[in-house]
């Protein structure tokens, strides 16, 4: 399948990447318009170390964060471009283990469908630069959203998913439900917000396997998947960003994606 071929090519490109060279947005956009090519939009700003961890790539050549990637070939040489949106900087590196013929083979079964990036057409300059526009106006499906923990049964399920047993001390408070277990406290608000407070003497709950960005993101991803992921309906979770906000402290943010489109909730 195209997915399996694309996955394999990306893993090989990351594993064999040469030292990257900085490029501007013009060259990056030219790469997006060059055939053959495989384009990856991660929707959020993923640290390269996290992407490598998820894809089981054992390489530290590439650094920074990546929002977009394109694997393309120029004069028989396969190139991997990526765009670091937070730094407004692009990078390119070569891969000597992938032949241009393999890239051609991966995309050979695809047919031209007229889709363009907004930057490729002057009449689309009012749109965000990397918006992809089809010739036909798509007809979106209408979805609705509800608070998945409004009922007591769902709240109890969430409590157990977060590792607070059914026999934990619990009581209602102003606009929320408070649960205590081994001096750890969980606040489940009526509007869906959940706050965890570790015991003052420290807690073994939600321990990470290491101190790096990959361990922080992966630990949070597993926790988010076993809670939010079980209550997200047809949406899936994606990583928006991961930032270190103090020594050993990380702010990891996830969002909802529905059929490839980012979902905005409330005041987002």
Regions found by a protein language model. Name each.
Residues 1-215:
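Preferential activation on post-signal-peptide N-terminal prodomains/segments
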Residues 209-268:
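Extracytoplasmic beta-rich ectodomain segments of secreted or membrane-anchored proteins
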């Amino acid at each position: 399948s195209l997915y399996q071929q694309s996955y394999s090519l990306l893993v090989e490109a990351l594993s064999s990447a040469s030292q990257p060279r900085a490029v501007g947005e013009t060259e990056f956009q030219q790469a997006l318009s060059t055939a053959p090519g495989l384009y990856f939009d991660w929707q959020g700003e993923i640290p390269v170390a996290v992407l490598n961890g998820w894809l089981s790539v054992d390489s530290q050549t590439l650094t920074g964060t990546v929002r977009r990637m394109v694997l393309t070939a120029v004069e028989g040489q396969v190139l991997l471009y990526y765009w670091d949106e937070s730094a407004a900087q692009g990078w390119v590196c070569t891969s000597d283990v992938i032949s241009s013929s393999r890239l051609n083979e991966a995309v050979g079964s695809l047919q031209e469908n007229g889709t363009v990036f907004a930057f490729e057409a002057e009449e689309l300059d009012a749109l965000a630069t990397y918006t992809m526009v089809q010739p036909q106006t798509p007809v979106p499906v209408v979805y609705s959203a509800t608070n998945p923990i409004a009922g007591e049964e769902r709240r109890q399920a969430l409590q157990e998913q977060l590792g607070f047993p059914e026999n934990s001390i619990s009581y209602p408070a102003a606009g929320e439900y408070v649960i205590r277990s081994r001096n750890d406290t969980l606040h489940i608000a009526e509007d869906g917000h959940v706050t965890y407070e570790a015991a003052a003497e420290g807690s073994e709950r939600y321990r990470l396997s290491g101190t790096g960005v990959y361990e922080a993101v992966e630990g949070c991803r597993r926790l988010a998947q076993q809670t939010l992921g079980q209550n997200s309906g047809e949406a899936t979770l994606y990583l928006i960003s991961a930032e270190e906000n103090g020594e050993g402290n990380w702010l990891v943010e996830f969002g909802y994606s529905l059929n490839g489109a980012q979902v905005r909730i409330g005041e987002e």
